[in-house]
């Protein structure tokens, strides 16, 4: 839940939380950084919110993503303040704006500035390394529920591909803030050199490598199919950790320019800033 994650990183854990929408996505991280995580109640997700639970928790502020702003009147009718953050059109600016807006409401402006500075540094550091790169790999970022869905240009996955020194192979399809269903014929026509799948996908790398329908694709033939980290929280979503997604993308596409050691230094810096913790490459699922 990228919206709730903004409150987690600005509080350095569960400081501002009385309830969760969905605990599952980043459970491996939240269990370690949010005291009493298991006791925090889930109040529903998406448009299925249990208003009685929200009211009973004595909620002072509800934060919603733009795609669920139609729920605002329900909370206003219950006299609960609502803050709409996280634009549906995803980019690094979306993350900056989300952290800035919520930090103002929580009085965490200085903390937000430090996190945004780290995010900006990842792209800034990548640019000079990529100056002389003439060949940028074509990449397709697949969706989680189906391998026959792709990230279009309006999603933050495209920003990650480009910041890491690649080119999104997807063309001719678009949608705001969601993966687009496509046919295997379309993916074959794009013939990506690299395929990334989310860590939370319902299928595996081997599923693709062993599927004859995919066998003519460059990324499959050269076994350049990778799980986008991390095992404790997604780095490919519009959250503060997307800066680590930039660093991993750069390492994955151009390992000669950006080493695993450099990547892990940035990982340690980020998690120290946000949670005063560090994690090993093994814990993060980074090979």
Task: Report residues per predicted region.
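Short, structured coil segments at secondary-structure junctions
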Residues: 13, 36, 78-80, 164-165, ...
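Short helices/loops that flank or line small-molecule/ion binding pockets
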Residues: 49-58, 181-191
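Extracytoplasmic substrate-binding proteins
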Residues: 71-149, 170-171, 227-287
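A ligand-binding cleft/hinge motif common to bilobed small-molecule-binding domains
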Residues: 69-77, 198-210
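A short, structured surface patch at a secondary-structure boundary
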Residues: 1-57, 61-67, 169
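Structural recognition of the beta-strand scaffold that forms the well-ordered cores
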Residues: 16-21, 61-65, 81-86, 137-143, ...
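Alpha-helical, coiled-coil/dimerization segments enriched in small aliphatic residues
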Residues: 150-178
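Alpha-helical scaffolding within the catalytic cores
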Residues: 121, 125-128, 179-186, 209-215
